[in-house]
Structure formats: C-alpha cells, structure tokens
Amino acid sequence: MSDIKEKANKIKNILFILFSAISLSISYNFNVSILGWLALIPLFYSLKNETKFKKIIFISFSFGSIFYIQALYWIIPTLQAGGVNIFLSIFALLLLSLTMSLEFIFIFALPFYFNHFGCPAWSLTMASSWTLIEFLKIQINKFAVWFPWFSLAYTQNNNLMPYTYYVGIYGITFIMVLFQASIAYSIEERKKTMLKIILFSLFVISSSYLSKKLVLNSPSQEKIKIAIIQPSVDYYKKWDLNYFNEIKKDIETLISSLEDKRIDLVIWPENALPGWIDDKDVFSWLVKLVKKTKAYHIVGSVSRIDGKHVSAFLISPDGEIIQ
C-alpha cells in the first residue's frame, strides 16, 4: 500500500512540475499575466511536502529544464541559421537548459530548511530566496555569461508597471512569490488562513489591473512623436566588412525618410549600428544622421566602455551622448 502511495505521489509531483513549468512559460511567451500569479502554486506545493533534499534537487532540475527549454526555444533556429546541425542545436538547448536549472537549486535549498517553522517563515524565505537569486543573476551577468532576462515581475509588465516606481521589479517578484508560496503552504491548513490569503490576493490583482486602466486612460498634456527604424540587418553580414557600406546605405535611407516629419525620438534596434560606437568613424557617421533628424536617438551598439557589452545610448539632437 505504501508503494502505491509513493508512486502516486511521484506521478502527482511530475504533473505539478509540468503544469508549473508550462504555465510559467506561457505567461512569458504569450503575455498571459494572470498565470504569473498562479503557475508556481503546484510547484511550491510539491516542494513544501518534500522531506528529502535529493528530491528538492530533482524537482529543481526538472522544473528548470522544462521551463528553460520552452523559454530558450529560439536557440535552435538561431543555431540552424548559422549552419549548425539540427541534432547539435537540440543538444545545445538541452545542455543550456540543464545548466540554467542550477539556479533553482539555490532558490529552493534555503526554504527546505525552514519548512518546519510554518507558513509565514517558509513563504517569506521562498520569496526572499527567489528575489535574491534574480538580483544576483543580473549582477553576475556583468562579469560572466548568463541569462538574467526571466524576472518573474516581467510577466506583469502590462499590469503592475505603476508599482515598480515604488518597489522596483524585485518588490513585484517578492510579492508574487510570497503570495503563491503562502497559497501552496496553506492548502492543507486552516480555512480561515486560506480565505485571508485569497482575499488579499484578489485585492492586489484587481488593484493592479485597475491601476493599469487608470494610467493608460489618463490623458497626457504632452505628446511626443516616436519613430522606430528597422534596417533588418543580416547578423552574418553585420561583422563582414564587405557589407559595411550596404548596411550604412539601408540605415541612411530609413533616417532620410524621417527628416521632414518632426520626430522627437528615434529608436534603433539592439546592436543595429554597423560597428562599435566607440570607433571615431562610426560615431561621426552616426552624429551626421542624428543631426539630420533634429531628434533624440536611442541607439543600441556594442561598446568597449567598462568592458565589452551591448548597450543603449541616448544621443541628443546635437550628436552628444547623454546617457
């Protein structure tokens, strides 16, 4: 009988892991904000009931791998575009997803040791641990290669944006994890506790959607005209000097079409500049284009300033880098 129960628990945990990983991925990929508030509840429920640390490691790897396979799916067509074999591309995605899933071991390890302290301690530890790892991922990315994009708060970009002014993305992440961890822990607890959490969550979620509506519907006294240019530069031509003039000509054509339209801000795609913005010739060419439009430009470019990074530069109508 105990074997049957153990197998049933394993199947249940696997289903919960699958549900959480797929739901969270849908929240990111298809902008389904509400899933950001619900996706982790089954996962946290499984974690809360585990008494062996090796199972925490298994859950971490399983959830992380399944989530990142979906979140980083674009790596396969990107590698294929570069001539990499389909099987090698799939292997690269699987290996990267397994590596990325390591972060969840660090997230779930600390709450495991706080499980016996009850709902408040476990939920607060889970929220703190998750938020800390999100913060560290961004800091680590300044010195090493990692993927810090998937902050839980990003799933709420259409709803909780006004609140980031007060608490930042880390505050949003903390609240979302705290809510879901509390729900998961309280499923088998007293009904009064569950009711309080549900009422509080309904208040937070409804107020976030209301604030979005109020902010978006508030008339603005000042209007600006924004243009977005898209030169569609082939990445494999990007660093080939034989195509340098061709890329410049395409960008010049796009900029020329904006000259008489009184644009206030021109936004370039990430890394669209044909070369390094630090190079004197490239920057001089860029300044001429900026002055033609008499507008501010946000330009994405690789830069040697403080290391080699892709950065966004705000350039004034006079051709000076402001930020």
What function would you assign to each model-found segment?
Residues 2-213:
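Membrane-embedded alpha-helical bundles of multi-pass enzymes
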